[in-house]
Amino acid sequence: MPERLGLVARTRSAPGVLNKLTGVIAAHHGDILSVDIAGAGTPDARVYFEIALLASPSALVADLEALDVVRDVTVVDTLQMIYGKRIIIIGGGAQVGQVAIGAISEADRHNIRGERISVDTIPLVGEQPLAEAVRAVARLPRAAALVLAGALMGGEIAEAVKEVRAQGLLVVSLNMAGSVPDVSDLVVSDPVQAGVMTVMAVADTATFSLDRLKRRKF
């Protein structure tokens, strides 16, 4: 079974650095699960990898550090291990805040028992900004569920919801005007309860399952 590990390579900022790093990882049969670059354009860039690796990481680290563009390499805990699954809450500020109360309170219960769930929020208004934000959630690392919190959402936002659901993202909507509730996985009237149920739906330490529900609107 491959081990999932995190690596931070401190490198020079230059064209072709990522190509050299990934070439070494491929030579060690590492499967790159995630990559992020911090400090690009500065003298010291930091390239973070999450890799599935069958062998010990020591040989991989040594070969990476042998590259002329690499200053040093550190093995770190993965962001999956530290922050875990992400709940993304988008919409009107008042509703987002109430959903966050429920989500954070429920996540606390599961994280105490060894789960890792984090909660991200962004208050937004307007059909186009909201639709763009919904589509972007599918590109966020470790995003497990999206909660749409507002009084009226439809049109392009509903189309965006269909797209991200087709990519496997769980979408929960408050009971609101517009077509978004009609295309979401779960509709909840109370915002605090919406946050609670979303966390329960993604937590490995919970017995709650959407597949066992006889209805999807509460």
Ranges and model annotations:
Residues V73-V76, M81-S209, L213-K217:
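Conserved mixed alpha/beta catalytic, RNA-binding, or beta-rich assembly cores of soluble enzyme
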Residues M1-I90, V96, E106, T121-V125, ...:
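A conserved regulatory-domain signal marking ACT and ACT-like small-molecule sensing domains
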